[in-house]
Amino acid sequence: MTAAVQSPVLPLLEKENVADIAIPEGDSTYWWRTSGQDLSRMLQEAGYPDEAKRQFLNYFRDTICPTLGGKPDSNALRTAVGWDGSPFEYSFEFKESTKSAGVRFVVDLTQLRPGDKSAPLTTKTTENVIESLSKKTPLFDDNWHRALSQWFVYSHAPESEQKALVAAAGYQTNIIMGFDINAKILDLAPGYLPIMAKSYFPPCFVAEAKGFTRWQALSLGIRQIPDIGSHPNILLALKLIEDYVAAKPELAGGARGLSTDFVKAGKARLKIYMRYLGDDFEEVWDYYTLGGKIPDLESDKEMFRDLMTLSSPSTYTEEDWKDTQVDPRRRAAFKTKPTAVYFSLSPDKPYPIPKVYFYPARAAPNDKVIARGLDAWLTKYNWHDGGKSVEERVESVFTHRKLEENPGIFTFIGLGRKEDSTKKGLSLQVYMTPELYVTPRF
């Protein structure tokens, strides 16, 4: 259906050739030469079909890269995604019931390089990408996205108010976009891109503007969706979370975001993202289960306990630290990254589907020991497919430094039940950031 479908498969760039290419300052090809190639290698490592790779990478190069502006420099405004300010975070998804890996990523498309000084909360660049998705992705529907935008986004506020909100929040991000690259779409909906998209909204601006807590901003953001009353299971699931937070009011400040899918109401989910400052596993587990109110989770408990050890300093030895270059800036940034919990609300369940995200870089000496810990976990629970390890895959994807040098590539490690009510089992998401602000590469 699109011209991109007819173009040849986009090749991986050889490392030695990339190093010889002069990237003009401000040229959007920078993003193709960095994140484009990272994602290309991820799709290769995950075994995606050539046609799915070609269609996605064409779209990424031709639509997403030009939106991102110039190469980051010392004056570049930070995004709300990567720990270093990078606009990208990628993930491999592994499932208990299947041996194939999936590839996802989120990107902050906010106009930051350069920024819009008179309208710092503009969403024009993000909306341009959403408009392109409306024509190229199957079952596209943005009604819930629009409803949430009216609540969370302050791009139409007066300039003085926008600047005050940015000063209070510490960043300019109204919306973050998420992409699930799904090759099955090529068979189920020929002619469309192999992409399912979602949008994420931080609560900070509406909380600041209206005097709410961040948790109130999220909860009320759901309740103000015009047709939400037609989906009683979503409201029942939300009430379980509201009751838990009401009993533990210290959790309200940990509200981090709300997302929805670009599909019609009745199929779309709403996902609530929370941070949790504690390190006690039993407390984390109580949060994950909402005090035991979410059914059928107890049998998974030891798998979560084992995964959480990757975030514990006691897990690592002097031998693990021997090759690490200690970077105080990184260590300070990682100390601010607590455990996270998300709750997915869907129209077909009266309770949320939860997931816990651990942040092993808070304690781990470097990325190599995190990768090996993940591989040991996958092997212990018989998830490893006998092919490449996580360590080998990640080393193939990220070529800008060695994993043993520092932590920072691995970010959150998420584990939780699948959301599809017809399927059982757990899914593991391994999040990674390309470190493009601290390591621009070119």
From Swiss-Prot:
InterPro entries from the UniProt entry: Aro_prenylTrfase, Aro_prenylTrfase_DMATS
Keywords linked to the UniProt accession: Transferase
Pfam families: Trp_DMAT (PF11991)
CDD domains: PT-DMATS_CymD
Pathway field: Secondary metabolite biosynthesis; terpenoid biosynthesis
Transmembrane segments: none
Source species, domain of life: Eukaryota
EC number: 2.5.1.-
Signal sequence, start to end: none
PANTHER family in alphabetical order: INDOLE PRENYLTRANSFERASE TDIB-RELATED, PRENYLTRANSFERASE ASQH1-RELATED
Comment field on protein domains: Residue Gly-257 plays key roles in substrate selection of farnesyl diphosphate (FPP) for farnesylation of cyclopolic acid.
Annotated function: Prenyltransferase; part of the gene cluster that mediates the biosynthesis of the phthalide-terpenoid hybrid 11'-O-desmethylfendlerol. Within the pathway, mfmD is responsible for farnesylation of the cyclopolic acid intermediate via an O-prenylation reaction. The biosynthesis of 11'-O-desmethylfendlerol begins with the NR-PKS mfmB that forms 3,5-dimethylorsellinic acid (DMOA), which is then transformed into the phthalide 5,7-dihydroxy-4-(hydroxymethyl)-6-methylphthalide by the cytochrome P450 monooxygenase mfmA and the hydrolase mfmC.
Family indicated by similarity: Belongs to the tryptophan dimethylallyltransferase family.
Name of the protein described by the UniProt record: DMATS-type prenyltransferase mfmD
